[in-house]
Amino acid sequence: MTALRIISLHIYQYGKFSNRTFDFSASPVQVIYGLNEAGKTTMMSFIESMLFGFPKTKKYEPKTGGVYGGVLEAEHPEYGVLKIERTKGTAEKLSVYTEKGEVKQGDVLKQLFQGTDRSLYKAIYSFDVFGLQEIHAFNRDKIGEFLLFSSLFGAEAVSKLDSRLTKESERLYKPNGRNPQLNQELETLKQLAVKLKQAEAEEAGYHQLLEEKRTLEARLAAAETELKETAGHIRMIEGAIERKPLLNEKATLEQVIAEFPEHAGQFPADGLHQLEKYESHLHPKSAQLEALRVKMAELDKQRQKLIPDKELLAKETLIQELSAAFHMYQSWGEQLAAIQAQLRQTSAQTAAGLEQLNKTDENELLNMNTSYDYEWQLQQAVQQYVQARDRKRQLDETFELARQELEDAEKAVRAASSAILENSQRKDKEAALRAYDETQGQHQEQAKLREQLTFFERQQAKQKKTVIAAGMLFIVLFSLLQQWIPAISFGAALIVYWLVSGKSSSRNSRETRQPMTDISPAEAEMLREALWEDDRNKQHLLTQRAALQQKEAAYERVIQQFEQWEAEMAPSFTQVERFMNELGFKEDPSFLLDAYSLMKDVKKEVKKKHELTIEAGRLKKHRRTFEERVSMLLPVNQSQDISISDALHTLRKNIEREKEIEKQKKEIETDIHYTKEQMLELEQEIQYFHAQIEQLFAAAAAKDRDAFFAIAAISRQLKDTENKLHHVNAQLQGGYPEELELADSNTLSELKDKQFVENERKERLTEEIEQLRSQIALLSVKQEQLEASGMVSDLKLQTEMQKERVKETAKKWASIQMVKQVIRNKLERHKKIELPRLLETAGEFFRPLTDGNYQTIYFSETDDSIMVMHRDGTVYHAEELSQGTCEQLYTAIRFALAVTRQGESKLPFQLDDSFVHFDQERLKRVLHVLYDLSEGGRQILYFTCHEHVKDAFHSSQIIHLVS
């Protein structure tokens, strides 16, 4: 056999698919999974279209344009890999590409598929769950027609062919119709016959001829009738001769039956079978009754041992209530632990706050005013106090600065006053200078030198100030940075520099004073410089005195600002002191707001502490009440040494134990009751079977079992004789009553004599009939001559022509009836030969599908409906099967049809959710059958939307379609 396997599909445009490629696995069973509207039916139609051409009715042409069609790639053992490309524009185009690069036309597909078209493929290889769900409604004729025509011509061929033949037959003839062709031709023939009779009546002498002819025809009919009667007598005599031995045997058997005793016929028809059946039921039931009595005694012992604690069971509701409320008890414990932790934390925070506030009594804080108005007044008072304190600090700094500046100004005035020359010294210098000017007026170069020396000294003094200032700056910087060694080094360097520069100044001063004694030019210049410096010092003194007056005025203004501050800020200090007294705060007033905030927090913690203490007491009370309720349910010796959870667990365990005891007791009581009912039922059945056996003995007129068997033997002999007599009577009933009466009233020799007489009479009648037929033939010739002379001949011709037309139309109608009869004969042959073979193959599939529960499929002999036989011998009609089993039956028949009708070609199966109603076991078995069916390379494509069906296959076998 050759098997075609689809490798892949490439869809150009087909239905909802556009430019899609689907690759099939090498597994013979391939699953195409997708939800509703995912394209499963579209893919099935695409495969059929690629193999057999596009459908003419239900088309899948693209709505948005594009190439309608695609490519199907398949593998064939003989042709190798084939690519079937089919597209449709104005006309359908088909190309078949081989793996050798050859391009073939559609004839290769017809050869490959061996004449299988789309309808035959859908009838054999493609089916779904709705195909034959009502299979139980089909009888032998219906399913035979369906399977035959679906296998030969397609599923719809039977109805179309039958309808077409019926229409053509009714177009030609209907028994009571007017319009059909044969009905009209017969009506025309009838009218011509009437006209012919009228014309014949007008012919003279014609009627006499006809009368003579009718007389001969009547004699001929009478002779033929007598001949038939004679033949009947002969047949009756022959039948009597055949039945004469049977009558003799019947008489002998009746005599033998009459010799049997009268009670032999009273024995029940199936007495031995009934006795065996009753005894076969009686013995096991007696054994069952004895076993039940032993079981009854054992159950009664077990019941007496089981004594449940009724008092504890009465408390089951309370224990269940406490068990249900145990989570509340645990919750109370957890809440209590959390509250105690919070209480410890709150107490610690309260103690820390009191310690920080330097207080010991926490109740003082409860009376503290924490209103918003009080807090606002406190904030205002503290804010004013802080502002006053900051203002005083600023005034202190200003006062200190003004005082320092005043002292500096006084020192500067004193320094400037000390730098001015006394009047005597100034006068001496002025006199010396005037004398020098008078005597030394020509020493200009010396004067220039003195000016340069003076300039150098000024530059040296500026440099000295710069170095000292920089040194002091570095000393202060290193002191701030706490780097004492660099600071000390810079200090020592400054001291050395100052000493060296001082000696240089002293040396210069001495050099300057030396010319004064000599009244040198340099000395004279120094005198002028000294007088000029004295004038400048006087001017500087005036400036310092003016600055001193300004500093004194600023000092007075600071003192006035102190007095104004004392007048304005006194109420703020008073208000702050009041708040400090009210709050018991003795520290710096600037920290009063922080202390107040801390007091509020501590007050909240104190309140929280009191609330937590109250809540802890409430929870302890709830837990104590719950513990007391649980303790009341426990025995006295256990109530003190067990936790609540263990106590509840023990109570629940005890309840469960007692309930289990009570349950076991009830079950045993139920078993006892059921056992009593069984014993009563068995006793009644045993009594019934004993009564039936007694009735059976009474019916046979037997005293005991031995007598019953003796009578049974006599009855069996009588039955055999009666059966022989019945067989003889059945053979005699096959003949006519006249034959039996004739055989009974005559001997065998008398019957043979009568047979000889009737045979001679038959020969005489045969000769007479031949003579009459010759005479009638001569009269018919004369009649034809008369009819040929006038109108009668024309009408006769028309009548004969019309008869020919009627014959032609009747032949057409008869040929249609013959075709219908041929089809019926073909169906009958298919039902008798092919259909049993098909059902045998279907049974081979049906057995593994049902796990061997059903063995055989056949048709009922009464109504030709489908019957199946269970493995226990029970026979079921199709309508008595479950839906799943009925679908298994349908699946087996479809598989058998494919196997028996596929010829030499194996095309892929397409199953559309055919097993949706199967459970897991049925699905597993049908998958095994599918794999067995796929042996030899047959490909099976299973389309489904169900998850559990998909999960039964390997992932490599599944193609997913997206909705």
From Swiss-Prot:
Q: Which residues form a coiled coil?
A: 176-236, 373-467, 536-570, 647-789
Task: Note the topology in the membrane.
Answer: Single-pass membrane protein
Instruction: Tell me, using the record's free text, what induces this protein.
Output: Very low induction by mitomycin C and UV irradiation; probably a member of the yhaONM operon.
Q: Which UniProt keywords apply?
A: Cell membrane, Coiled coil, Membrane, Transmembrane, Transmembrane helix
Primary location: membrane
Enumerate the subcellular locations listed in this protein's record, separating them with semicolons: Cell membrane
**Official protein name in the record:** Uncharacterized protein YhaN
Per the UniProt record, the source organism is Bacillus subtilis (strain 168)
Q: Which gene carries the instructions for this protein? A: yhaN
